[in-house]
A protein has these predicted regions:
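Acidic, glycine-rich flexible loop/linker segments
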Residues: 205-241
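Short, conserved "active-site rim" segments that organize catalytic pockets and cofactor/ligand binding
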Residues: 104-156
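A glycine- and small-aliphatic-rich helix-loop capping segment at beta-alpha/alpha-beta transitions
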Residues: 175-185, 214-221
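N-terminal, positively charged, Ser/Thr/Ala/Gly-biased leader segments
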Residues: 65-123
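Glycine/serine-rich anion-binding loops at beta->alpha junctions
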Residues: 157-180
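Amphipathic alpha-helical scaffolding segments comprising HEAT/armadillo-like alpha-solenoid repeats
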Residues: 1-7, 25-38, 57-67
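Phosphate-handling active-site elements
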Residues: 180-202
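Structural detector for internal amphipathic alpha-helices that build alpha-solenoid repeat scaffolds
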Residues: 1, 13-27, 36, 45-56, ...
Length: 241
């Protein structure tokens, strides 16, 4: 924020770059500096764009609303929020998604994905994710994570498929582990992923909601004829496989 407001200078990061990077924080400590930059001659437009895609503003909404009485750029931010540009600018859900299956027979509970003995490592998602499916089980190889990596080499996204998915209480750390292996990188947020595909004959409601909130395409379907390594096409709008 000091670079963006020109309190200090940096040869590597310009004030415009700094304003852009503030906008990648999604909310919190970046909000007040961005509001102060709205009327900056150099960075004002970049601050508008950054705030238009920032939702975690909390009480600072009132500050922007008050500022909009005298600031055109603050008015632009309110208009962008009102028109939900942050949402409508996102990529549309594809009409068809081709994916390759990683199937785990039987019930997968959150302890399979985020084992309690490894709870100490849950804040470190890449490390904790190494414990996913660490306990041997029938129908799964002894090195399941390596098998996921082999499936990825086919060039398609990997879908986690099971009979019963996500029972148990550790749904967030379990989701983090799953997405670390089959999800997509989040720009400017290290060591965490989004997206991914999960299909279950039954999916526990709290895990279903947590996966949805994490950007996962998760749904229930008949998985009896879906087998490890199968390539399938999902048609989200039609609700068909």
């Amino acid at each position: 924020s000091d670079i963006a407001s020109k309190k200090i200078s940096c040869e590597l990061i310009s004030p415009m770059d700094a304003t852009y990077y503030l906008g990648t924080m999604l909310g919190g400590y970046n909000v007040e500096p961005l509001i102060s930059l709205l009327d900056d001659p150099e960075c004002g437009d970049a601050a508008v764009k950054a705030l238009s895609n920032t939702l975690l503003v909390f009480d600072a909404f009132n500050d922007i609303a008050e500022k909009s009485k005298s600031s055109e750029n603050a008015s632009k931010v309110l208009k962008s929020w009102a028109e939900a540009e942050w949402f409508l600018s996102k990529p549309e859900v594809p009409e068809r998604i081709d994916t390759i299956i990683f199937k785990v027979p039987g019930e997968t509970n959150t302890d399979d994905l985020s084992p309690a003995p490894d709870a100490w490592s849950r804040p470190d998602i890449p490390l904790h994710a190494l414990s996913m499916y660490k306990m041997p089980r029938e129908g799964l190889t002894n090195e399941p994570l390596k098998e996921i990596e082999e499936l990825k080499k086919k060039g398609l996204p990997v879908a986690l498929v099971g009979d019963v998915m996500g029972t148990g209480s550790s749904r967030k750390s379990a989701t983090n582990s799953v997405l670390w292996h089959i999800g997509e990188d989040i720009p400017f947020i290290p060591n965490k992923k989004t997206g991914g595909i999960c299909i279950g004959e039954k999916v526990a409601p709290i895990s279903f909601n947590t996966m949805e909130d994490s950007g996962t395409l998760v749904f229930e379907a008949d998985v009896e004829n879906l087998n490890m390594g199968d390539v399938i096409s999902i048609f989200p709008a039609k609700g068909e496989i």
